[in-house]
């Protein structure tokens, strides 16, 4: 499998590296880094002061060179009536997106003794692996430690591992 990472907007080298490393370690796949892209026209919703996640998925699918493609952006994303999303993917689709905007809170609430930088890096890895998992046909998992567990808050992201549980692993690999 080949996953193409599509940076959209200003994405740091650290975020690109963490995303790439996370995908390689969990899915043992080939990962490439696409040329940076501009924010998609029409993605911004002025009433919400946020960006439509679907527009980033469409961009990743359109310009990405992989069988699976994931956009990464620092912009604050939303989907339909949800206040925000960390990421979005369509089950079995070729495009997905994560936003680092809400992953950058300074601490994990005392869950671990890691630095803010380490916590952020782990969140990026988890969300990239989670969204690409959806494109591979994985649905949300009830196992709170599994990377495919639904995590609407950063606290819940922090609880899960950067790996698939046995059940999800059997379903995808």
Swiss-Prot record:
Question: What does the entry list as the binding residues for Zn(2+) 1?
Answer: 130, 134, 140
Which cofactors must be present for this protein to function? Zn(2+)
Enumerate the active-site residues. Answer: 131 (proton acceptor)
Keyword Zinc applies: yes
Broadest EC class? hydrolase
What does the record list as GO biological process?
proteolysis
As to how many cofactors bind and how, the note says: Binds 2 Zn(2+) ions per subunit. One is catalytic, whereas the other seems to have a structural role.
Coiled-coil ranges from the UniProt annotation: none
* Keyword set includes Metal-binding: yes
What keywords would UniProt list here? Hydrolase, Metal-binding, Metalloprotease, Protease, Zinc
| Residue stretches spanning the membrane | none
Q: Where does Zn(2+) 2 bind?
A: 141, 146, 165, 168
EC number(s) for this protein? 3.4.-.-
Provide the GO MF annotations for this entry: metallopeptidase activity; zinc ion binding
Q: What does this protein do?
A: Probable zinc metalloprotease whose natural substrate is unknown.
Name the HAMAP family on file: Archaemetzincin
How does this polypeptide assemble, per the annotation?
Answer: Monomer.
- Which family, according to UniProt? Belongs to the peptidase M54 family.
Q: What is this protein called?
A: Archaemetzincin
Source species of the chain: Haloarcula marismortui (strain ATCC 43049 / DSM 3752 / JCM 8966 / VKM B-1809) (Halobacterium marismortui)
